Amino acid sequence: KVLEDQYKSMKAWVDYMTKNSKNDLWNTGFHFGDWLFYRPFDDNDGRSAVTDKYLIAQSFWAYSTQLLINAANVLGKGNDVSEYSSLLKRIKDAYLKEYVTPNGRLISGTQTAYVLALNFDMLPESLRPSIAQRLVDNIKDYGTQLTTGFLGTPYLCHVLTRFGYDDIAYKLLLRDKYPSWLYPVKMGATT
């Protein structure tokens, strides 16, 4: 019942993003980006933790479209499944052309960019292991700490464990030095 009630608004949201995209890229208008990411330094070597806001928008457009496809499947809306599956392919193809270099690197080499690309399956399966390794390398380069903000953080440990990096996920989870999830607890925070 809830899915039936919300289906129209889900479809309207995906249609809004589609209408406001250009050449299958949602890179127009205002986008927040990854809010409250940790920025320890920016040494001008491409290690800044700032993730391209349009890469983020494209990733979440794909995710929203996938959720709509899932809902359409459950509700037996075969025409919508077909239509939005075609759209999803175009969204991911445009992502590859715009945000992935010919040698398989993301143009935005941040933890959030890697996490979203992997969590939302934005990349061909052949590229995923190397991108997962780049994520781990980035985490280690920052002293085994996260630099993700609100948009990358919820998926970080899931992506690490999905690609076999349980040890890194546990190190991040159990870290109690700033920045970390346990630092506020160690400092006596109660919320």
Predicted features and spans:
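Active-site core of glycosidic bond-cleaving carbohydrate-active enzymes
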Residues: 1-191
